[in-house]
Amino acid sequence: DSNTIRRSAEIFLRQGGHEVVLAEDGFDALAKVNDHAPELIFCDILMPRLDGYQTCAIIKRNPRFAHVPVIMLSSKDGLFDKARGRMVGSEDYLTKPFTKEQLLRAVDEYRRGGSAV
């Protein structure tokens, strides 16, 4: 479930030496992005209240955060889902469940220092 995946991602990232800020839903994510100015954002597509696509689009429309890489997370592995993520501005897409290695590889590829939400 989402809490298990979120907790696993948090553990993997902390073990990799990264600072992690978690959000409960899309609105919480937007507030935390504003407060913490992360260098990389992981965005679950199926977040409550404001889904990951909407959250990513709002982040990318904000000039302050448009440059921040967003990696979408989803249990769906369809071409349409990946294309929709690209259309709203995400840089990459990880399919759940993902391994620690896949998650940290994505961080290494996109992170320029700082925290991940």
Where are these regions (language model features)?
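Two-component/phosphorelay signaling modules centered on CheY-like receiver
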Residues: 3-21, 35, 110
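Receiver (REC) domain active-site loop signature in two-component systems and cognate sites
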Residues: 47
